[in-house]
């Protein structure tokens, strides 16, 4: 098994659409209540078969726990939001052993919406949140489509939009 790490923003995943068979998350969506729909859309974009979310369950929580989640801006209504976006929650499994009873975790097993698009056998880096492929020139990852360069520091690609460098001159034809 090989592992490639990169730095990215969860709102703009720098992978080509439909290139990951099973995507998982463990409390990564939790503090992003205002961005749940945006995050689900991008997760659906890259997921081929299943999205498995281990996230707090507002619906399974107590009144005190719901108040806490509301005050912290945590996500809620995962099932409803998934279905609005065309996905399907096939199972919700409450996790019995939780460290904080005011933050009960559930495992949401989700099928992403069916869309006609190119699927890839393996992950390919792209301009964050898009399917514009980027190429590795050793020092940078570069997009001929957008003119953006992304730095590589100590072998780790930094694939955040706010870290990109606009370098159109690098792509001009003589």
Question: What residue ranges belong to the model's regions?
Answer:
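Core SAM-dependent methyltransferase catalytic element
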Residues: 93-125
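Conserved beta-strand signature within the Rossmann-like core of class I S-adenosyl-L-methionine
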Residues: 47-60
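Hydrophobic adenine-recognition pocket in adenosine-nucleotide-binding enzymes
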Residues: 28-29, 56
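A short, conserved alpha-helix within the catalytic core of class I
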Residues: 31-42, 46-47
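Conserved SAM-binding strand-loop segment of SAM-dependent methyltransferases
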Residues: 2-12
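A conserved beta-strand element that flanks and buttresses the S-adenosyl-L-methionine
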Residues: 24-25
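Short cysteine-rich clusters marking metal-coordination/redox-active sites
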Residues: 125-130, 142-144
